[in-house]
Curated annotation (Swiss-Prot):
Localization per Swiss-Prot or TrEMBL: Cytoplasm
Gene: argB
Protein name, per record: Acetylglutamate kinase
Functional note: Catalyzes the ATP-dependent phosphorylation of N-acetyl-L-glutamate.
UniProt keyword terms in alphabetical order: Amino-acid biosynthesis, Arginine biosynthesis, ATP-binding, Cytoplasm, Kinase, Nucleotide-binding, Transferase
Family, as annotated: Belongs to the acetylglutamate kinase family. ArgB subfamily.
Entry keyword Transferase: yes
Enzyme Commission identifier(s): 2.7.2.8
CDD domains reported for this sequence: AAK_NAGK-C
């Protein structure tokens, strides 16, 4: 027996149908393409946001897009260090990482957070595989070199950040193999150096390097703000390098947004078609950005 739809619900049903139709050209455009997603920020600690993120990733794979997830975990590392009685020191936003801290960071990133994300995706029917930059020589790191001015003399001096690294080479073979076999790679930001040491890498930087090496169609950087804002607080939805340089010069782009924007520019320079900075706390923000004309963040392109 056929059941008739409740007439009062028809507007909602039609709106959903219109959304699906609106998505059609984007589904056709992005089928078979690779999207690299940097997952981090406070959304990682919110159970509803975790599920929203996992749903987005599983949906992308289901419609023929190849998502590659690279995650952070700074707050979780900090919490574990505090629990273990290990004090943290930061220089220029980077955690000074001695041998004990490096061991804890790898444990939290590769052993805990990585497998939690794999579990969320698996719980929704996705086939996720958790790896780190160490696996199959995915990422080769080298020690970050930093300097700062001495407060009294003004003379630049070297700052030893310990086992903090930056990617110098990426071999994306394992990621290509996993996506081709219908898996969703989930990557923890730790990697080996040529010296055999394990380095903790900023997740934004690592995700951008992986996106460039894969020639990804899109690089999504999920954070805790709507994107790049102008001085009145309004979202800037579309930026190229010239616009970014001007916004940095007049101090519109400042502070922690500078390295995020620079990571996106570097990814685009390396071959990514476009990068997007968007608020990971907004439910299904990626889907709004990908499949609607309205978008949901700041698109950075050549």
């Amino acid at each position: 027996m056929m059941t008739m739809a409740d007439p009062s619900k028809m507007p909602d049903l039609l709106a959903k149908a219109e959304t699906l139709v609106e998505a059609l050209p984007y589904l056709q455009r992005y089928a078979g393409q690779t999207f690299v997603i940097k997952y981090g920020g406070h959304a990682m600690g919110d159970p509803e946001a975790q599920r929203d993120f996992a749903e987005d990733v599983v949906l992308l794979k289901a419609v023929g897009i190849n998502p590659v997830v690279v995650h952070g975990g700074g707050p979780q590392i900090g919490a574990m260090l505090k629990q273990l009685g290990i004090e943290s020191t930061f220089v220029g936003g980077l955690r000074v990482t001695d041998a004990a801290t490096a061991e804890v960071a790898e444990m939290v990133l590769a052993g805990k957070i990585n497998k939690e994300i794999v579990g969320w995706i698996a719980g929704l029917g996705g086939r996720a595989v958790g790896i780190s930059g160490k696996d199959a020589n995915l990422v080769l790191a080298e020690k970050v070199k930093r300097s700062e001015a001495d407060p009294s003399s003004g003379i630049e001096r070297h700052v030893d950040l310990g086992f903090v690294g930056e990617p110098v080479a990426v071999d994306p073979t394992i990621l290509a193999n996993l996506t081709n076999d219908n898996f969703i790679p989930v990557v923890a930001p730790v990697a080996l150096g040529a010296d055999g040491a394990t380095y903790n890498i900023n997740a934004d930087t690592m995700a951008g390097a992986i996106a460039g090496a894969l020639g990804a169609k899109r690089f999504f950087l999920l954070t805790d703000v709507a994107g790049v804002l102008d001085k009145s607080g309004a979202l800037l939805t579309d930026l190229d390098r010239a616009a970014i340089d001007a916004l940095k010069a007049d101090d519109t782009i400042t502070g922690g947004m500078i390295p995020k924007v620079e990571t996106c520019v570097a990814a685009v320079d390396a071959g990514v078609e476009a990068a997007v900075i968007l608020d990971g706390r907004i439910p299904h923000a990626m889907l709004l950005e990908i499949f609607t004309t309205r978008g949901a963040g700041t698109l950075i392109h050549r």
